[in-house]
A protein has these predicted regions:
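Histidine-anchored nucleotide/phosphate-binding helix
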Residues: 15-24
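Short internal beta-strands
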Residues: 28-37
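Short hydrophobic/aromatic-enriched beta-strand-loop microsegments
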Residues: 30, 47-58, 126-129
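Mid-chain, well-packed structural core segment of small domains
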Residues: 60-100
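Short, acidic/small-residue loops that bind anionic groups at enzyme active sites
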Residues: 95-115
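Short, glycine-/small-residue-rich phosphate/pyrophosphate-handling segment
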Residues: 110-132
């Protein structure tokens, strides 16, 4: 499965810790991330990450394009609710597209862990049927 990972600046360390904790599960899938987040994940996990541009340079738009083409199966976007809203339209577009195309989406650690555990148990295999 193709997993999109994004983290606001204040959540990047949390994303690193999350990917360290679930490295074994994530290593069985393709990981896509915005530029800085992807680089930070690679540094601590040695996972291969397909990196988009940095989020503020269009990385979230690149992810959105893959969602529109049904090429992403799950998105974890660790958002900082206190973050400036400078690229909020891009964030809202990703949320809208995930809702439109029935792509599981998490914005916090609790939901992210539920999605990764579901992934581990095969509960998201229905995504493969949709892609055909």
């Amino acid at each position: 499965m193709n997993i999109g990972l994004i983290a606001h600046d204040a959540k990047k360390i949390l994303m690193q810790n999350f990917t360290i904790a679930y490295r074994g599960i994530l290593s069985k899938h393709e990981i896509y991330a915005t530029g800085t987040t992807g680089r930070l994940i690679e540094e601590v996990t040695n996972l291969t990450v397909h990196k988009y541009l940095a989020g503020h340079l269009g990385g979230e738009q690149q992810l959105a394009s893959q969602i529109e083409h049904n090429q992403i199966d799950m998105v974890i976007f660790l958002r900082d609710p206190q973050s400036p809203k400078s690229h909020e339209p891009d964030v809202m577009n990703v949320i809208h597209l995930c809702d439109t195309y029935n792509i599981p989406f998490a914005t916090n650690l609790a939901t992210a862990e539920l999605l990764v555990k579901a992934l581990e148990h095969g509960d998201l295999e229905w995504r493969e049927m949709i892609k055909k």
